[in-house]
């Protein structure tokens, strides 16, 4: 195990379920699909922001990196559960960086994560 790639994670993906209000499928986060990731990743802090005085809110941002040569089926609609139990939301589409010498391969994946309190 590398010093920087030391976090075990599980991808949480919402199940699709019927809505009582329409015929469209909706996300069900009460019972998400848990997808274990078979290799450790790096989770690094990116900073935080605080809301105004009228609403106490803190948004903490993190960056996820996979080891070189590892692709990850992570979607913008997913969440990530850390081994500590913390659940972070994926913020935007994950970036699948191409390998510089193997055009058909992914070098690594980067994703922005965040958690909002308040």
Task: Please report, for each region that a protein language model flagged, where it lies by residue.
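Short, conserved turn/kink motifs that form compact alpha/beta structural patches or helix kinks used as
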Residues: 24-118
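Active-site-proximal polar cores
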Residues: 1-26
């Amino acid at each position: 195990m590398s010093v920087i790639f030391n976090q075990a994670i599980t991808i949480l993906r919402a199940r699709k379920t019927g809505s009582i209000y329409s015929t469209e499928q909706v996300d069900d986060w009460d019972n998400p699909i848990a997808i274990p990731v078979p290799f450790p990743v790096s989770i690094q802090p990116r900073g935080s922001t605080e809301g105004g005085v009228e609403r106490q809110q803190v948004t903490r941002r993190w960056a996820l990196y996979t080891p070189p040569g590892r692709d990850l089926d992570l979607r913008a609609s997913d969440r990530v559960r850390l081994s500590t139990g913390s659940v972070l939301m994926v913020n935007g589409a994950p970036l699948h960086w191409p390998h510089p010498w193997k055009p058909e391969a992914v070098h690594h994946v980067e994703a922005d994560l965040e958690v909002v309190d308040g």
